[in-house]
Each structure stands twice: as structure tokens, then as C-alpha cells.
Amino acid sequence: MAVQQNKKSPSKRGMHRSHNALALPGIAVEPTSGEVHLRHHISPNGFYRGRQVLKPKSEA
């Protein structure tokens, strides 16, 4: 079993943990419809960067 040779100082411990933070997802608001979607993804109503790229399914 691996055992550390020397005790890690609080500073080194903090530097080691500095990459463990959780990042928030990149969320954007579509300017044409105001809907929220992930960055670089099509909005639920078929818009991407202000242009209609997919026709929305008709709600029947």
C-alpha cells in the first residue's frame, strides 16, 4: 500500500484540490424566442444563432 513520505502542507493540499471545483453548464438565451439552451446547441424550438435550422414538431 502506498504511504506518503512527508506530510502535505495545507497550501499544497489546497493546490491539489484546486481542480476539483464543479463547473456550471454553459447556458445561453436564444435572442429570437428567449428560450434557454446549452451553448452551441439548438434551442428547443429549432433556432440556432438567431436562424431557424429545424422546423418544430407541430403540437397536435
From Swiss-Prot:
Keywords: Ribonucleoprotein, Ribosomal protein. Residues 9-19 have a biased composition (Basic residues). The keyword Ribosomal protein applies. GO terms for molecular function: structural constituent of ribosome. One of its GO terms (biological process) is translation. One of its GO terms (cellular component) is large ribosomal subunit. Pfam families: Ribosomal_L32p. InterPro entries: Ribosomal_bL32, Ribosomal_bL32_bact, Ribosomal_zn-bd. Residues 1-28, 41-60 are annotated as: Disordered. Transmembrane segments: none annotated. Belongs to the bacterial ribosomal protein bL32 family. This is Large ribosomal subunit protein bL32. It comes from Verminephrobacter eiseniae (strain EF01-2).
